[in-house]
Amino acid sequence: MARRVFVLGGHTTTFIGKKHPDFIWKRHPDFGKRENPTLEDYIVQSVTGALEATGVEAAQVEKAWIGNFVGELFSSQGHLGAALVGAHPDLLYKPVMRVEGACASGGLAFASAVESIRAGTDVALVAGVEVQTTKSAREGGDILARA
């Protein structure tokens, strides 16, 4: 019989896209003074927010997954398992797998964690994180067309 799987909770970061008043672009009054959140910033916010929301200690996490589509092209960072581990010192040396499946990357990461729990893992952490505003519309469209 398969083990039952429970989702304890999660966290959603604030969306700051190109139409958001806090999005920094060349005509924004803070242009040159501050920058938009990076992919790594969102990973840290997602992980720490989920741990706080669920009351789970990072040390209790046995395995983790991160879903992302072409982080290496939008953010020059493809090795996102290390970025997730960097979100909390108690995640150091935990196995983390990046899952990529275009628009389904986060969902596939979640499905992978569910299967791991059914196989015996007690506590898994999943993050789905994207930053796709680092390129021009033309470059971004070209990258997204690769899906």
Regions found by a protein language model. Name each.
Residues 1-96, 118, 128-147:
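Conserved "HGTGT" condensation-loop signature of ketosynthase/thiolase-family condensing enzymes
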